[in-house]
Regions:
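A late C-terminal transmembrane helix in Major Facilitator Superfamily
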Residues: 303-335, 342
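C-terminal transmembrane helical hairpin of 12-TM major facilitator-type secondary transporters
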Residues: 250-296
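Helix-to-loop junctions at the C-terminal end of transmembrane segments
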Residues: 40-53, 238-251, 331
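Conserved MFS/SLC helix-loop-helix module at the cytosolic interface between two early adjacent transmembrane helices
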Residues: 39-75
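Cytoplasmic helix-loop-helix junction between adjacent transmembrane helices
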Residues: 83-121
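Extracytoplasmic gate region of multi-pass secondary transporters
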Residues: 9, 188-229, 236-237
Length: 399
């Protein structure tokens, strides 16, 4: 999933230079991928039988490999749009099924272990970035897509034996209704959290799509590709790291801190320039984008707001679709303005997180059922990971 979803970022500059892809078309391809991801995530959420099917998992893995290879076979933007749409949908299905299997098979293991498992997304980012870093001097944009497909085949063979958890129908409450939240104050906290997480979806995805291209504007191409490898390496331990901090500090405080750090990291290449700024930016971004999801989804589950994780994931996914569209008009002037816009949106998310801190109930709100059930199909980069949140051991809170 890390390869299929994120390899486009380091290949994008090669497609600009060698395939004649315009900046606007590049943003459209990114949007298509995020639309596909939302479609796949919704399918996994509302058709639970898909989540428990080994056939669906294996079909999605093979289809994702085919979508990567297909990118090298054409120069038609329309076909590319369809392929990236499919890659997004297949990535989401793989992720949702992997979450289900993870919760099933690691339920009795230490709570931090799922956090490390979600580091696989970071590993996929790092491996695909390293692949493009090597190929940019000896290959072309086509060979980069072919190589990413080969890498995906190798990872598919490793994941082939994964056993999804069979779908289980949730028992209704005594009244047959959805669990209710405890009142207006709970709605206020959830509204602030929803706004923060949706804004994060917009802001993070602009950087996640264009960071390498922005760095390559003023530095050698190898620096941009190397920075993307650092993003992946920093992402590997990030979920477990933020989950560990969550045992000492409140999620709203950590969410505010993570968003602030992320905004600084995103803005650095546009404000400072230079190799050091690019590499520091990559580390700060990689260390926070999965952690923010961990903290936000954990806070939503803690509030026990009905369908909290599903609603948060939907807002985040819509934000990811809007991000490239919002940034697209700025791309004619290069990518630095897009990064500044991204940082500004993430700062707005931090402001909403600051409002969330006011009166946030550190004990679970009274009069509510557990908000479990949502987390198992929470799609996000949205990556549910170990944070010790109520619904499941180490997983309903994930980025």
């Amino acid at each position: 999933m890390g390869v299929g979803r994120f390899v486009y970022t380091p290949i994008l500059p090669l497609m600009h230079a060698q395939a004649g892809l315009s900046a606007g078309a590049g943003a459209d391809l990114a949007t298509a991928n995020y639309v596909g991801y939302l479609i796949g995530a919704l399918a996994g959420t509302f058709v639970p039988r898909l989540v428990g099917s080994s056939i669906v998992l294996r079909s999605s893995l093979l289809a994702l490999v085919a979508s990567l290879a297909g990118m090298a076979l054409t120069q038609s933007t329309a076909v590319w749009l369809l392929l990236r749409l499919g890659a997004g949908a297949f990535s989401a299905m793989i992720f949702v099924i992997a979450v289900s299997a993870l919760l099933s098979h690691l339920r009795e293991h230490p709570a931090h272990l799922p956090g490390w498992a979600f580091g696989g997304v970071g590993a996929g980012i790092a491996l695909s970035g390293l692949l493009v870093l090597v190929l940019r001097t000896v290959g072309t944009w086509r060979s980069a897509w072919w190589a990413s497909a080969v890498l995906a085949v190798l990872l598919t063979s490793a994941a082939w034996g994964l056993r999804p958890e069979p779908a289980v129908r949730r028992a209704p409450t005594a009244s047959g209704a959805e669990p209710r939240s405890s009142g207006a104050r709970n709605h206020r906290w959830f509204s602030a959290l929803f706004a923060s997480y949706t804004l994060e979806g917009i802001g993070y995805i602009i950087a996640g799509t264009f960071l390498v291209a922005a760095i390559n504007q003023t530095l050698p191409g190898s620096i941009g590709s190397g920075a993307w490898v650092l993003v992946g390496l920093a992402a590997i331990p990030s979920s477990a790291f933020w989950a560990g901090l969550g045992r000492r500090w409140s999620r709203p405080d950590l969410l505010l801190a993570a968003l602030g750090v992320q905004a600084v990291g995103i803005a650095l290449p546009a404000l400072a320039g230079g190799v050091a700024a690019a590499l520091i930016s990559a580390v700060l971004f990689g260390a926070t984008f999965i952690g923010v999801s961990t903290l936000a989804l954990g806070a939503g589950a803690h509030l026990r707001f009905p369908r909290a994780v599903a609603l948060l994931t939907a807002g985040y996914s819509v934000g990811q679709i809007l991000g490239p569209l919002v940034a697209s008009p700025l791309l004619r002037h290069g990518y630095h303005q897009a990064l500044l816009l991204s940082a500004g949106v993430v700062l707005a998310a931090a402001l909403a997180a600051f409002l969330l801190r006011i009166g946030f109930p550190h004990a679970a709100p009274e009069g509510t059922e557990r908000a479990g059930g949502d987390h198992r199909t929470a799609p996000g980069v949205v990556l549910p990971t170990g944070s010790g949140s109520p619904p499941s051991p180490g997983c309903s809170a994930e980025a």
